[in-house]
C-alpha cells in the first residue's frame, strides 16, 4: 500500500460472487495488519461463506431484503424502502468507527459520499444494463470494472482491469483445486 500506516477498511457486499471477488483482498489486508470490517446481507449462501472464512461480520439484513411479492408496484416500493433501510443501517454502522476506505457492490458509496470517505464500487455490467446503479456511481469515488465495461459518463471514475470478476478467484496463482473433487469427476490426469 505504499506506506506503513494501518488503515481501517469497511467491505459491504450483498452477493456470494462478491465474497469470492473480495476474499483474497480482505485476507491480504488483514495479513498486512490493516483493520477490515465486513458487512453483508442474507443472500443465498453468502453468510455461510463468510462464516466458513472465519471472519467477524455484521449482517444488516439477517432475513434478506428481497421482496416476495409479484406485483411490479409492490416490488418497486419494497426496493425503495429496502434501499432507504440499507443506507440508514450503513449510516448507523459507520457512525461507530472512522474508516479510511469503503469497498462495496452496493449502497455504501452513498455513506462514503456524505462521510467523505473514499469509496470503491465494483461493477461488471455496462451502464445501459443497470441504469439504476447511476446513483451509486455518482456517489462513488472510483468504480472497479473490467476494461471492456462501458460505464458511459462514469468512465472517468473507472479503474479498469484486464479480465473479468472470476479472474480474481480462478487465477492459477490463487485457485487450488481440491483433489477429492478432481477424483470424483475423474479429472486427476487433466489437472
Show the residue positions of the predicted features.
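Conserved nucleotide-sugar phosphate-binding/catalytic loop shared by glycosyltransferases and other
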Residues: 6, 13, 31-79
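Structural motif
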Residues: 8, 99-101, 142
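Short, acidic/turn-prone active-site loops that include or flank metal/cofactor-
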Residues: 16, 40, 60-67, 123-130, ...
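Short amphipathic alpha-helix
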Residues: 16-30
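An aromatic- and histidine-rich active-site surface loop
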Residues: 44, 101-115
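A conserved, positively charged/aromatic
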Residues: 120-122, 129, 133-143
Amino acid at each position: 500500500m505504499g506506506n506503513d500506516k494501518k488503515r481501517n477498511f469497511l467491505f459491504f457486499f450483498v452477493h456470494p460472487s462478491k465474497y469470492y471477488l473480495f476474499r483474497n483482498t480482505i485476507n491480504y489486508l488483514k495479513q498486512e495488519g490493516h483493520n477490515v470490517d465486513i458487512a453483508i446481507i442474507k443472500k443465498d449462501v453468502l453468510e455461510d461463506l463468510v462464516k466458513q472464512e472465519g471472519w467477524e461480520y455484521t449482517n444488516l439484513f439477517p432475513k434478506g431484503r428481497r421482496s416476495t411479492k409479484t406485483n411490479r408496484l409492490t416490488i418497486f416500493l419494497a426496493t425503495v424502502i429496502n434501499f432507504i433501510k440499507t443506507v440508514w443501517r450503513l449510516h448507523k454502522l459507520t457512525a461507530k468507527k472512522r474508516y479510511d476506505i469503503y469497498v462495496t457492490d452496493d449502497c455504501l458509496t452513498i455513506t462514503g459520499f456524505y462521510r467523505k470517505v473514499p469509496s470503491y464500487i465494483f461493477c461488471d455490467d455496462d451502464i445501459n444494463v443497470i441504469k439504476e446503479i447511476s446513483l451509486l456511481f455518482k456517489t462513488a469515488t472510483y468504480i472497479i470494472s473490467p476494461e471492456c465495461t462501458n460505464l458511459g459518463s462514469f468512465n472517468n471514475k473507472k479503474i479498469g482491469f484486464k479480465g473479468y470478476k472470476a479472474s480474481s478467484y480462478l487465477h492459477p496463482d490463487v485457485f487450488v483445486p481440491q483433489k477429492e473433487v478432481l477424483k470424483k469427476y475423474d479429472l486427476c490426469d487433466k489437472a
